From Swiss-Prot:
Xref: SUPFAM superfamilies: ARM repeat (SSF48371)
Lineage: Eukaryota, Fungi, Dikarya, Ascomycota, Saccharomycotina
MF GO annotations: nuclear export signal receptor activity; nuclear import signal receptor activity
Entries under InterPro entries matching the protein: ARM-like, ARM-type_fold, Importin_beta-like_NTR
Family: Belongs to the importin beta family.
Any one of the GO CC terms: nucleus
Note: Present with 9760 molecules/cell in log phase SD medium.
Protein name per Swiss-Prot or TrEMBL: Importin beta-like protein KAP122
Self-association and partners: Associates with the nuclear pore complex (NPC). Interacts with GSP2, NUP1, NUP2, TOA1, TOA2 and WTM1.
The keyword Transport is assigned to this record: yes
PANTHER family: IMPORTIN-13, TRANSPORTIN 3 AND IMPORTIN 13
Amino acid sequence: MSSIHEVVALIEELYSPHPKHDVNQIQQSLQSIQKSEQGFHLANELLSDDKYSANVKYFGALTLTVQLNTRGENDYETLWNVFRSNLLYLTKFSTLYVSNPNMYGQSLIIIKKLMSNLSLIFTKINDPQLNNAGNENMIKQWNNPINTFIQLMSVQNQNINADQLLLDSINCSLTYEQLSQFVSLSQKHNELALTFTEVIVEDLTKFQTKRHSMSQIHEVVHEHLYISTMALINLNLTAQAVFNPTVFDCITAWINYISLTRSVSSSGRMDLSEIFQNLIDLMYQSTEGSDGYENAEKILTIFGNVFANDPLLMSYDLRQQIECIFLGVVRPDSGITDISNKNSWMLQYMNYLVTNDFFSELKELAICIVDFLQINTLSVCNKLFTNIQAADNGQVQDEYIQEYIKVLLQMTNFPLTPVLQEFFSVRMVDFWLDLSDAYTNLASETLRPNSIELSTQIFQQLINIYLPKISLSVKQRIIEEEGESTSVNEFEDFRNAVSDLAQSLWSILGNDNLTNVLIDGMGQMPAASDETLIIKDTDVLFRIETMCFVLNTILVDMTLSESPWIKNIVDANKFFNQNVISVFQTGFQTSASTKVSQILKLDFVRTSTTLIGTLAGYFKQEPFQLNPYVEALFQGLHTCTNFTSKNEQEKISNDKLEVMVIKTVSTLCETCREELTPYLMHFISFLNTVIMPDSNVSHFTRTKLVRSIGYVVQCQVSNGPEEQAKYILQLTNLLSGSIEHCLASSVQLQEQQDYINCLLYCISELATSLIQPTEIIENDALLQRLSEFQSFWSSDPLQIRSKIMCTIDKVLDNSIYCKNSAFVEIGCLIVGKGLNLPDGEPYFLKYNMSEVMNFVLRHVPNCELATCLPYFVYLLEKLISEFRKELTPQEFDFMFEKILLVYYDAYIINDPDLLQMTIGFVNNVLDVKPGLAIGSKHWTSFILPQFLKLIPSREKFTIVAVAKFWTKLINNKKYNQEELTTVRQQVSSIGGDLVYQIMYGLFHTQRSDLNSYTDLLRALVAKFPIEAREWLVAVLPQICNNPAGHEKFINKLLITRGSRAAGNVILQWWLDCTTLPNYQG
């Protein structure tokens, strides 16, 4: 070992703010010394010499920890030596500390480390698994470290180096008087005793998660340390002298320990009732004048921890007292007196927090009280609405209930700004949600006679309280005072939680007492004072926006198109529709010159557009109401497209507005197709404007608008297919013409490429919107003219299909676009749009098999195979699925040769993605029509031998795909008898090779890929049980040398007959042969 001076120098350098050498090297050097045989002696040297600094002495205590963990586990002599030293030095430094805390204040960190060491020793000594060996003189149990500590501190003037004195103190007994006398010596004596017991249970709480069993340790704690500590804590809580706040940390540690151990300890319940009662009494004594409510705040933190994590630690009687303090009401039969004084303390405390703007402390109080209320929401529910807890005196009971309701609502309606200043209303949302759920689940026979009236009264008041609480005026104030802080996010969460609460309350209040009330509140008076529909009174604007926000949540899950009720209530509120539009218009016209105005502008538009979209079903009943909404929405879009500001934030805001509006337009068009027919030409005219490349509109809006128009075009059925085709032709000419005009430019910059890609997506969106939204049988108008539509679109007299194909060909014939996967993807998407639609459905974009094949053959040779080929192959998969009845093996061969086989050796085999794609293509054929592949001339000459070689691949996706191929080949329910016979013969002929490749791949694979091989092997054993034995017997010796394991494996595997149990057998063989442990075992 280095000299003591060198070690001390290293320690001082380690703890210095600017060490000269590498800290890691210093740590490694010191750690090697700590773990060595000289470590114990080093610790004693560092702790015994008074000239060393606190850092050096702390390192000495830390060295005892290292010795304890490295050498004290199995060596009793080391354990005893470390135990002895810890007791000696704890007594030494504690004596110095209590004698002069100012001079020896730095010793406290050393004292706590020594206490932590003794805590670990306490655990080791009392663990029978650790001390079951050793000599007879070995200490088998250490009952009470607090008694030991007090005893040693009491005999400090004697020679405590004497081992006998130490041994006598280890399990000594102390009377209550001795304990009381010790803690009364000084505040520091008291503080050290509290700290020691706190350290012990904190460590025990940590150890509980690491050790399998600590039942005996818990028993020792329960019978000894618990009793002393409860006496110690209660002495502190009831002391008339100077109060020591350390007791609160000690109580918290013990609560956490008891909460953790009461479910695992067999020693019975460690009761905390006396402590809780003393805490309640002490809380009353904490006032503004006495300690500025400092103790009250700490006690409420303790209670909050109990209520949130383990409320049953507190007895029912104590919880009734707390209820009296928090709410000022108690059950008539509780026996609690002095109710008003108890609650007045809480009101004074709240007033103190509010008056002094202690909003953080007020938030903690709110959390504590609401956590208390949520301990047993069902009990509160029973109090209010059932006869289960009714008192004998009905009048007294009614008065109690009314008072209880009043307090709950007052707490919810706390008179400050939510989130920013008060948190009661925020946290109470969870309570009311739980209460409403509990109420809806009550058995009807238990309800009080007036429960329906009472619940309506409570929950309607609740809605009235929360509406102004979630107003955007609150959000405005938060942003003005704190900017875009976490408080804004908290407010948004609060607002959404209240809307969820309203949705939950609807099941109790229904339309009559909730939905209709909101609509009445919005529709009785005009919010805007002139024809511009701009709401100038901000209070009115905020109020109506809030009701719109909540109303949307309630309406969103209703089928309004089938609800006559909505028509009647809106008719009775003639300003409802106008006021919804006014919120939208006001939002759009709001200046966005400041951050807060930008945010609120978006909120107003978001709320109104969301509600307009939700009302789409209502407009099906009242189509004449659509006109002002459509005008407002397109006026909003027009405003967005004419946006000219260079301010980046304003541009971002404008883009968001545009997205909100076009989404709502799309929702209306999808739901109200027939009702919007009169606006169709207006929509197309607007599209003509925004489709131009110089239009200030996003690609998203262009594609959404085309889809929206397509919805309306789709329902143009009553006048025959010619009328529908007229609109489709007009739209395709517009889109195709714009694409071709752009392609004609000699330079294709990124801007032009993005524009063409957008227009292709517009064609795709148009094609999607023209697909029937329901089955044909549900569309009477189409059903009456079905044959007419089928004939028209089959012949396509306007040549719409060929025009669209021509446009796509022109794009992909371009040398830039043909190698860009984005254009290939959208091209294939459009061409395949009409594939796999229901039989007999007339559709304008159904290409036949030769047209699709010609498209693929035309563009594959020029594309970037690595990125583009998968889209063409996916299109072929759809083609095979669509024309599976007509396709022959010869046509499959043609596809396979021209699209895959020709590129296999040069490209596909070297690209895992393309390889997976190729195998997947064949798998798809086996799914759709297996005869196409099995009858192919390439089946036995290429597909089977190539896919056989791929089984032991190292690429995960290749393994998955090829295993799926062979599994599907072996076990396919879509074979006819001839195909089944052919496949069995083919598998039988290559069975040996197949099993070799499977077992070779299985043996060399990683564990995560075992399932693919397992599924394949299970299928083989299930379908070829007899042959499988022969194949395995022949193959396994070639894989690895484990004859006994192979025989066992074969026997077990065949017994499973391919069931799921085979998985465990295969796994065990793999583990045995790769010499890995089975961690599942």
